[in-house]
Each structure stands twice: as structure tokens, then as C-alpha cells.
């Protein structure tokens, strides 16, 4: 009987610890997303890469991603994103060794263009409208800048099971086929 009581107490303590971790998660996610976006805005690529889900780099190296970021900047496109609010955090989806959350948030996105990119502003406008909707995308001609004031965005937060060491991936419809190469379809379906 004493063993049974000890097991019950241990299980109770463990469940309380899990609840305590879950209550801190929204603030962790908000802070992490703000940090990630700030690093992107300031072109701190090492910080961005360190915050990304490691399995992403089975598709291409960290150096290739750094070069892609730099190339976009060199071509004349500067994207800044300001977190407005975290709107929704999905219930956790567990696998045998990882946990996943989908985080929906709102942000102000600005896409400033110059050089080669400025020559293709109509194509960029169509691409942004296909992502955010026609009415959301505004163009500030004097600044050569597209503005999406209240963009709906999503990110995946992934950590080892029973850990708060979260890593992140931007989530958008254009990348779904890529995501399926590193995250199971079952997990993605549960997160939608």
C-alpha cells in the first residue's frame, strides 16, 4: 500500500511539473519569436540559424542558408517584420521524441526594394498578394516599400519531448512540400 501511495505522489508531482512548464510556454514563444524576428530584421544570420529546427539543415547546409539570406539582400530586398501579437498556440502534438506547437501570430511586414528587385516590383506585389491577400498589401512609392500592416503568420515550435529547448520554423503554404521531408504528415495534419 505504501508503494502505491508513493507512486501516486510521484505521478502527481510529475503532472504538476508538466502543467507548470505549459503555463510558461506562451511567454517563452512570444519572447523567442520576437528575438527571431529581430535577428532577421538586423541580418544576424547566426542567431536566426541557431534558433531554427536542426532537421531543416538536412535539406541544405547552414552556409547555403546564410548565402541565400545575403543574396536576397544584395539583390535589393530588405524584409522587416514586427511582432504585433501572438494569437493562438495549438495544443501540443507529441511524437516519440519530439513535441510540436503551431503558433499563429500577427505582424507588420515591410518589404523595401531597391536595385534589381525594384525593377520587379509588380511581380513582388503579386507574390505578396497571393500570400497575404489583395487588400492587405499596400505600396509606399516614395520609400519603394510594400507594407502588410496586420499579416497573419505562423511558426512551428519544436522541442525534444519533455524539454523547453524550442527551435522554430516559419510555416506557410508555399513550403508544405519541403516540411513534409522533415516533419511527418500526421504531425502537420494535427497542427492545422
What are these regions (language model features)?
Residues 1-24:
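Bacterial Sec-dependent N-terminal signal peptides
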Residues 9, 37, 54:
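Generic anion/oxyanion-binding catalytic loop in active/binding sites
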Residues 18-38:
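Short, low-complexity N-terminal intrinsically disordered segments enriched in polar/charged residues
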Residues 22, 30-31, 64-71, 120-124, ...:
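Generic detector of short, locally flexible boundary/turn motifs and exposed helical patches
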Residues 30, 46-100, 113:
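Short solvent-exposed beta->alpha transition segments
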Residues 34-49:
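Short acidic-aromatic low-complexity motifs
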Residues 38-42, 70-78, 133, 188, ...:
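Generic surface-pattern signal
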Residues 93-192:
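Exposed beta-sheet edge and beta->alpha loop/turn motif
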Amino acid at each position: 500500500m505504501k508503494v502505491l501511495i508513493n507512486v501516486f505522489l510521484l505521478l502527481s508531482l510529475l503532472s504538476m511539473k508538466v502543467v507548470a512548464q505549459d503555463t510558461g510556454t506562451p511567454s517563452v514563444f512570444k519572447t523567442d519569436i520576437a528575438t527571431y524576428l529581430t535577428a532577421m530584421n538586423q541580418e544576424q544570420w547566426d542567431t536566426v540559424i541557431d534558433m531554427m529546427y536542426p532537421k531543416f539543415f538536412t535539406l541544405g547546409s547552414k552556409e547555403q542558408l546564410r548565402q541565400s539570406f545575403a543574396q536576397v539582400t544584395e539583390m535589393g530586398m530588405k524584409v522587416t517584420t514586427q511582432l504585433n501579437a501572438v494569437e493562438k498556440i495549438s495544443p501540443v502534438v507529441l511524437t516519440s521524441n519530439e513535441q510540436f506547437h503551431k503558433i499563429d501570430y500577427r505582424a507588420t511586414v515591410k518589404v523595401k526594394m531597391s536595385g534589381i528587385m525594384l525593377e520587379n516590383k509588380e511581380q513582388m506585389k503579386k507574390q505578396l498578394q497571393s500570400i497575404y491577400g489583395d487588400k492587405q498589401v499596400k505600396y509606399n512609392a516614395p520609400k519603394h516599400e510594400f507594407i502588410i500592416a496586420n499579416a497573419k503568420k505562423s511558426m512551428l515550435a519544436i522541442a525534444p519531448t519533455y524539454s523547453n529547448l524550442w527551435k522554430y520554423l516559419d510555416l506557410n503554404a508555399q513550403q508544405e512540400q519541403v516540411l513534409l521531408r522533415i516533419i511527418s504528415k500526421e504531425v502537420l495534419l494535427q497542427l492545422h
